Structure formats: structure tokens, C-alpha cells
UniProtKB/Swiss-Prot annotation:
Belongs to the ESF1 family. InterPro entries: Esf1, NUC153, RRM_ESF1. Residues 497-506 have a biased composition (Polar residues). GO terms for cellular component: nucleolus; small-subunit processome. This is Pre-rRNA-processing protein ESF1.
Length: 619
């Protein structure tokens, strides 16, 4: 049903539907009339909905979110006592509304002006307290006046746990005009930050950050259920931090430091101020808050860090400040610095280790260690003093009788040298130790390179000597062969002239190598290894007839003792030839004997036939 006008009066409604306003059939029922009314007959235990455990199966406390049973109970049931109390309050409101103030009638809770003033003061105090506890802490919205422009800028309210001088220098260099330059950037601790950091070194974060015992007890007494899925989504299911106090503390940490940007002129500072003030630094939720520093203001505090140029290996740090953009704030008081974590994960080269400043990552010595060092130094001095003697007596001995004697001082250089070495070793820091080890490693490497060079030169010399030696060996071998031939020619006949000479006339290994080389292709043959074998066996010698004919002297080429030489090939060939001749000769004799036997058999058969014929009777 569309309405012609936006008014709610009866005149604006169509006359055809005017009955809807007065007819009770079209009146919507009230929500409280739909609920089931419960009287006093129902006890508290009967009305009590199902209770759940206070802790989960892991022992963690369950949160206080209202359960489904409680919501259903409030939706469908109501008690008559609560309903009657609500009706009485409605009647009182109506009676108060009917009071005639012109006749001097006043409500029962009327308060005089004097009482109202005193009560208003107390209420204002309580309201301020509650408002102060409930309000969310924010960075100051009303920024002070910028003042006269100067060439020095101050940067405040940033996450100084992650923001470094190099980050600010890179960000501001993008807005430097032509001819402008940023001389340096320094980060100083504020007075507020020094006081708070000094307190945190002893006490840690303020106690307001943590929940009070009353709040914890109230949490423990709560019986409302929470689903197992919600429990896993929440993680620990309960945190010991007060979220508002923690947010306030994290925002206060932004004021622990401030940065000072030194520009070469006022125009550069103005350009940076106009372009960067109020803008977000990357996507970290940190807004640049810039202020002009008046001329002549000096900073006596020692800066946390300084930067005049962008490092070569600069890499921006990816971070976000949870207190500025998240509902769940993270406590960063004991968080490990990001650059230290990155340094622990990286694998540095040797050059980076030498150039690194380890003092930024090493903790300072405590007073106790300094006291121990002082006591050790005193003991060393005392031992050195006691070693000085005069006439075989200690120089500083307590003697009442002073006797004149020739002064003779004895020193112990060995002890002094040892003590000095120990002092040098103790005074050497980590960086010097690394440099010393690197020098030793380089020295060893150079010595090793020298040794390798010497070995290479010696090998070259030895190879040259071997070449000359190989030539001389071949010449010497030829001379030895000639000498052996002469010895054989000049050898006298003696008793053992018929036996084999002790100096053999051939070398089987040389013959085998020569045969192997002959089997290769001509381009791969080594001519110096080929030996001309002039030995020719006498195959017709009757003394060696059985070697070629008797099977007891058969030669098996598959045996490993077989040596395939030219003479051996001739012997095998002769043996095959003779074996084939003997086989053919034997075959002929066998054929002749067979033919003779056949002829003799025929003759005997003829004689037997004639005898049989002669024995037959005549008719």
C-alpha cells in the first residue's frame, strides 16, 4: 500500500482503509503479551537453564558470551513479579505526569537547589572518572601551532621500534626540491621517554596494562558457554591484558623518541613539511607529525642513531602498528628488534663480517663483571710487584730495621711476557678477534698456494727429466742389445754349451706387447714398441714330431697360459696340417682293408658254392 504523503495523521490515510486505525482486529500484539508468564509456583531451580563447564578440556577458562539458552529464555518467558514491577513504574510515571505544578505539587524525588549543587558536583566527578576509564586513548588531535619556518624539523609520534633514521631519510628525500639537501637525521630520546624507559628497566611495563585480580575472579565465576570452534579461533581464550590500558601504553610508546631532520635551507624544510605533514608512512598507520624547531635550539642528549646518507644495502622494513589500526593490541615491550632477528637469520659474507659494527648488537658488560676485571688486574699488578727483589729480598717487604745494602733489582721477563699476553688476549674484543683469525686464515691460504706452486714446478721438472730419461733409456736399450749379441758371438763353448744359456735370447713380454701393437690400426700404433721377431721354428725337426702328431701335446688356445705369437701360430698351423694328413691316410688304409676283406669274402663264397655243387648226387 503506497502512501501519497509522508505524514502520519488520519487525513493522510485513504478513507477506504480508515477502519484499520480503530478496528482491534488489525491491532498488532505487543511483544510482552506473547511471552509465557511464570508465577511463583516455579522455583529458581526449575527456571534455571542448562549450565556449562567453566573450563574447556584443555583447562582454559571459557569466555562470557551469552548462550543460546539464556536468549531463548528471555525471548519466550517472563515472570509475573517483574511484570508487576514494570506496571507499577508505569503508573508512577503517569501519576507524576498528572501533577499540577501550578498548584505547588512536586514529585516525591524532588531535590532542592542546594542539594542539587552538592550532588551535581559529585556526579560530575564520577562521570568524569567513568568517561576517563571508558574513553579510548588517542594521539592528540589538536596540533599546536607550527610556528615560524626554520631549516630544522622535528618528527614525533611514530613507531620508533621499527622506524630508523634511514627510513626517514629515504622518505623525505623524495620531496626535497632542486638545490635542497638533507644534511642528516638524528633520533633523540624524549624526557618522557627517558623517565619511562628507566622505570621499565626495573619494573617492566606499568601494572595498569595487566588485568586486576577482581576482573579475573569475575571471569572465573562466569558460567556462560562458548563453542569449541570459537575457542580455537580465539587462541588462548583469555588474555591477561586490559585492552584499553594496553592501547594507552602502546600509544605512549610513540612519544619515547623524536627525530630531528637537519636541512640545508628553510625552503627544503618547508617543502618537506607541506608534502609530508599528516600523511601516512607507507601502509603502517603511522602519520607523519612534523614541527618546526626554532633557530638556536640545541639538543644535548646523545642520539640513539644518526644517518647522513642512505646505506647501499638499505631495505625498507615491513611492519604495522597494531595500536593504531587493530582492535587487538599487541604488547611490544619485550619484542625482539626486527633488525636483530633479520641479522640472526642471514648468512653474512666474510667482507660483511669485517665491516659490521658488533657493538650495536652486543650487550654491555655489567658492573659485576667490571669489578671482577678490576680485581684480576689488581692481582696481576700485585704479582708483578712481588717479583721485584732487592738483594734477594722483596722490594716492598715490611721491615722495621732498614739496613744499607747495594741495590740489585731482578726482573722476571718470562712472567711479565706471559701477563702481557694474557692482558692483550683479554682486551681483544670480538671484532679484533675475527680480524685476527681472518688474517691467519689468509696467511695459511697464501702458504698453501706457494706450496702448490712449488709442487707444480717440481712436477714439470720431473716430467722433463722423464722425457730425457726415456730417450736415454731407448738408446741404452739398443746398446744393451748390441752388447748381448756380441757376448753371444764371443761366448766360449764349455761343458754346458749344449744346455740353454742363462741369458735368454728373447723377452716374451716384449713380444706380446709388439703383437698387441700390430693388431691396432696404423694411426694408433706406437712404432717404438713394435719389435721385429726373427725367430722361426724348425717345423721339420724329427725330434719334435710328436708335438705336432701326438694328442698328449695338444694346444688349447682358450687357456690363459696360451701366448699368441707368430711362432705359436706357425706351430698351430703345422699341427692342423699334419692332423688332416694323418686323418686322410688312416681313411685310405681303412678303405683298402675293407676292400680286401670284401674280395676275400667273395672268394670264400665261390669255393663254398662249388663244394655244395660237388656234393649233390647225380640222377
Amino acid at each position: 500500500m503506497a502512501k501519497n504523503n509522508e505524514g502520519t495523521g488520519k487525513d493522510s490515510i485513504d478513507k477506504r482503509f480508515a477502519r484499520i486505525e480503530s478496528d482491534p482486529k488489525f491491532r498488532a500484539p505487543k511483544q510482552k503479551n506473547l511471552k509465557i508468564k511464570l508465577d511463583d509456583r516455579f522455583s529458581k531451580q526449575d527456571l534455571e537453564y542448562k549450565r556449562k563447564a567453566k573450563v574447556d578440556k584443555y583447562g582454559r577458562r571459557i569466555g562470557t558470551a551469552p548462550g543460546k539458552e539464556e536468549k531463548d529464555f528471555e525471548k519466550y518467558f517472563t515472570k509475573e513479579s517483574s511484570e508487576s514491577a514494570a506496571e507499577e513504574s508505569d503508573k508512577e510515571d503517569s501519576s507524576v505526569a498528572k501533577l499540577d505544578r501550578a498548584r505547588g505539587e512536586v514529585p516525591a524525588d524532588y531535590v532542592s537547589s542546594s542539594d542539587e549543587e552538592s550532588s551535581s558536583e559529585s556526579e560530575a566527578d564520577s562521570d568524569d572518572a567513568t568517561a576517563e576509564s571508558d574513553e579510548e586513548v588517542e594521539i592528540e588531535e589538536e596540533k599546536p601551532e607550527s610556528g615560524d619556518p626554520s631549516k630544522v624539523l622535528a618528527v614525533v609520534n611514530l613507531d620508533w621500534d621499527h622506524v630508523k633514521c634511514a627510513d626517514l631519510l629515504v622518505a623525505f628525500n623524495s620531496f626535497v626540491p632542486e638545490g635542497g639537501k638533507i644534511e642528516r637525521v638524528a633520533i633523540y630520546p624524549s624526557e618522557f621517554g627517558k623517565e619511562r624507559m628507566q622505570r621499565e628497566e626495573v619494573e617492566g611495563p606499568p601494572r595498569e596494562v595487566f588485568k586486576s585480580k577482581k576482573d579475573k575472579k569475575a571471569k572465573q565465576d562466569d558460567d556462560d558457554e562458548i563453542g569449541l570452534k570459537d575457542l580455537y579461533e580465539q587462541g588462548d581464550a583469555e588474555k591477561d591484558y586490559d585492552s584499553k590500558a594496553l592501547r594507552r601504553y602502546q600509544l605512549e610508546r610513540l612519544r619515547y623518541y623524536y627525530a630531528v631532520v637537519y636541512c640545508n635551507n628553510v625552503a627544503t624544510a618547508e617543502a618537506i613539511y607541506q608534502n609530508c605533514d599528516g600523511t601516512e608512512y607507507e601502509s603502517t598507520a603511522n602519520m607523519f607529525d612534523l614541527r618546526y624547531v626554532p633557530e638556536g635550539v640545541t639538543f644535548d642528549d646523545e642520539p640513539r642513531e644518526e644517518c647522513a646518507s642512505v646505506p647501499k644495502d638499505y631495505k625498507p622494513v615491513q611492519f604495522s602498528t597494531s595500536a593504531l589500526q587493530h582492535s587487538q593490541v599487541k604488547l611490544t615491550w619485550d619484542e625482539t628488534p626486527a633488525d636483530r632477528v633479520e641479522m640472526a637469520k642471514r648468512a653474512f659474507s666474510q667482507k660483511e663480517i669485517e665491516d659490521m659494527d658488533f657493538k650495536a648488537y652486543l650487550a654491555s658488560d655489567s658492573e659485576e663483571s667490571e669489578a671482577d676485571d678490576n680485581s684480576e688486574a689488581k692481582n696481576k699488578l700485585r704479582s708483578l710487584v712481588s717479583s721485584v727483589k732487592v738483594a734477594d729480598k722483596p722490594l716492598f717487604a715490611d721491615e722495621s730495621d732498614e739496613e744499607e745494602a747495594d741495590v740489585q733489582i731482578t726482573f722476571t721477563p718470562g712472567l711479565e711476557g706471559g701477563e702481557a699476553k694474557e692482558e692483550d688476549a683479554e682486551e681483544e674484543n670480538i671484532l679484533e678477534k675475527l680480524k685476527r683469525k681472518e688474517k691467519e686464515r689468509r696467511k695459511k691460504r697464501k702458504e698453501r698456494v706457494k706450496e702448490l706452486k712449488k709442487q707444480a714446478e717440481e712436477e714439470k721438472k720431473s716430467s722433463k727429466k722423464e722425457k730425457h730419461a726415456s730417450k736415454s733409456e731407448s738408446e741404452q736399450k739398443s746398446e744393451n742389445d748390441k752388447r748381448a749379441e756380441l757376448e753371444l758371438l764371443m761366448m766360449e763353448d764349455d761343458e754346458n754349451s749344449q744346455s740353454i744359456n742363462s741369458s735368454a735370447h728373447f723377452n716374451m713380454n716384449d713380444i706380446l706387447r709388439s703383437e698387441k701393437e700390430r693388431g691396432k690400426k696404423s694411426k694408433y700404433q706406437k712404432k717404438d714398441k713394435i719389435v721385429e721377431d726373427d725367430f722361426k721354428p724348425d717345423l721339420n725337426d724329427p725330434r719334435f714330431k710328436e708335438v705336432f702328431e701326438d694328442r698328449d701335446f695338444a694346444i688349447d688356445p682358450s687357456q690363459p697360459e696360451f701366448k699368441e705369437t707368430a711362432a705359436m701360430k706357425q706351430i698351430l698351423q703345422e699341427r692342423r696340417k699334419r692332423s688332416s694328413k694323418s686323418a686322410s691316410k688312416k681313411r685310405k688304409t681303412d678303405e683298402q682293408s675293407d676292400s680286401a676283406m670284401d674280395s676275400a669274402g667273395d672268394l670264400k663264397g665261390l669255393v663254398a658254392k662249388l663244394k655244395r655243387k660237388g656234393k649233390k648226387p647225380k640222377l
